[in-house]
């Protein structure tokens, strides 16, 4: 199925809406250059969440495939995709250690 529009669900600290998510991003990534890079990657994911995936990481708790996308050498976005319902779940954004726990 090809999705014309993707719905984003932000689950970084429990489920939050877009406004709360942007606030969370600004608090956690106050450097304007890094914040801009994160927003650019999210925009690319909005076009096609599979195209820029760095690696497949198994499945989320709903059974959807999980991926990561590289923002910088150390910063990753961990997300999953429900292609049947055109939903992208954002699970975590942070350092390699924070995202992967290692």
Where are these regions (language model features)?
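Basic, Lys/Arg-enriched alpha-helical interface segments
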Residues: 1-74, 82-89, 93-102
């Amino acid at each position: 199925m090809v999705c014309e529009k993707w719905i984003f669900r932000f689950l970084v600290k429990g489920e939050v809406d877009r406004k709360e998510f942007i606030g969370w991003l600004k608090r956690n990534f106050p450097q304007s250059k890094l914040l801009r890079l994160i927003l650019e990657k999210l925009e690319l994911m909005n076009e096609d969440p599979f195209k820029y995936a760095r690696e497949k990481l198994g499945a989320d708790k709903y059974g959807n495939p999980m991926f990561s996308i590289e923002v910088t050498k150390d910063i990753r976005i961990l997300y999953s995709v429900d292609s049947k319902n055109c939903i992208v779940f954002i699970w975590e954004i942070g350092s390699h250690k924070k995202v992967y726990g290692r």
